């Protein structure tokens, strides 16, 4: 099975990228983040002829996630059980019958957080990671495999930072989000739960592979970016991981998202 995660940065703006992903990679499951469209206005004309079941959890103008699956899921869940009616639309889950067992797929657009000093955005990021952790520990049956994918907005190690050492130091000094010690501690709890980074499993020392590139500074042109999009899997799946990648060819298209899709394949 092949899984692709892509922060599309506006579904209506980038149907050409979604179509190219499907044509080239033929994934079984696609997780989209930042679709920026309300559920009642979802553009089914973009997705109806692609060969997928389509599920979404969105709001007008911001955030929003979607799952596209070749097979019909047994269950779809939108949001965390602890979400209130004002919660941002950032997470969607599906249970799929697979050769690996009953697989829970969690697709998330994790808060960016802005900076340690931000009064609302930084605590919101911490809460989102805590809500995910609580969901895993209280709701998920660990005997079943699980895959978490999305724009997680954290660079887990210094290998995942490609913005230059001066910028790295400045971001840390000013408390800018992506690789703060607190963020890495939240992320580490996912590893402690038993999840593995599919990309790192097959590329343990790669330090030049990134999934996000800043528009304004034209970071894509000289490979200046961050690896903040991830596919994390439980051990049973990690053992079956045969290939991973970052689809830079899709990022190189006209009118692209600032993120590149990432993918992982399991056999």
Curated annotation (Swiss-Prot):
Pinpoint the site Interaction with DNA substrate: 259
Q: Which domain of life is it from?
A: Bacteria
Q: Which reactions is this enzyme annotated as catalysing?
A: Exonucleolytic cleavage in the 3'- to 5'-direction to yield nucleoside 5'-phosphates
Keyword Protein transport assigned to the entry: answer is: no
**CDD domains in alphabetical order:** ExoIII-like_AP-endo
What are the binding positions for Mg(2+) 1 in this chain?
34, 258
Fill in the subunit field for this protein.
Monomer.
Membership in a protein family: Belongs to the DNA repair enzymes AP/ExoA family.
State its role. Answer: Major apurinic-apyrimidinic endonuclease of E.coli. It removes the damaged DNA at cytosines and guanines by cleaving on the 3'-side of the AP site by a beta-elimination reaction.
The record ties this protein, via NCBIfam families, to: exoDNase_III, PRK11756.1, xth
Q: What is this protein called?
A: Exodeoxyribonuclease III
Organism, per UniProt? Haemophilus influenzae (strain ATCC 51907 / DSM 11121 / KW20 / Rd)
């Amino acid at each position: 099975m092949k899984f692709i995660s892509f922060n599309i940065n506006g579904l209506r703006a980038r149907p050409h990228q979604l179509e190219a992903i499907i044509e080239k990679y033929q994934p079984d499951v696609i997780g989209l983040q930042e679709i920026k469209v309300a559920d009642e206005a979802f553009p089914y004309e973009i997705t109806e002829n692609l060969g997928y079941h389509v599920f979404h959890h969105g709001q007008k103008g911001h955030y929003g996630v979607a799952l596209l699956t070749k097979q019909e899921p047994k269950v779809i869940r939108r949001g965390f059980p602890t979400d209130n009616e004002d919660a941002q639309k950032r997470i969607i889950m599906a249970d799929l019958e697979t050769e690996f067992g009953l697989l829970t797929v969690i697709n998330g657009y994790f808060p960016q957080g802005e900076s340690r000093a931000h009064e609302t955005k930084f605590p919101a990021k911490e809460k989102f990671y805590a809500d995910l952790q609580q969901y895993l520990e209280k709701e998920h049956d660990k005997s079943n495999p699980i895959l978490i994918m999305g724009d997680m907005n954290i660079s887990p190690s210094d290998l995942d930072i490609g913005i230059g050492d001066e910028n790295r130091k400045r971001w840390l000094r000013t408390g800018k989000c992506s690789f703060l010690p607190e963020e890495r501690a939240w992320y580490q709890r996912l590893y402690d739960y038993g999840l593995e980074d599919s990309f790192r499993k097959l590329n343990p020392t790669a330090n030049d592979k990134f999934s996000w590139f800043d528009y304004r500074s034209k970071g894509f042109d000289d490979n200046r970016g961050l690896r903040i999009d991830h596919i994390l899997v439980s051990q049973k799946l990690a053992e079956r991981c045969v290939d991973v990648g970052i689809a830079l060819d899709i990022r190189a298209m006209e009118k692209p998202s600032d993120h590149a899709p990432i993918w992982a394949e399991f056999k």
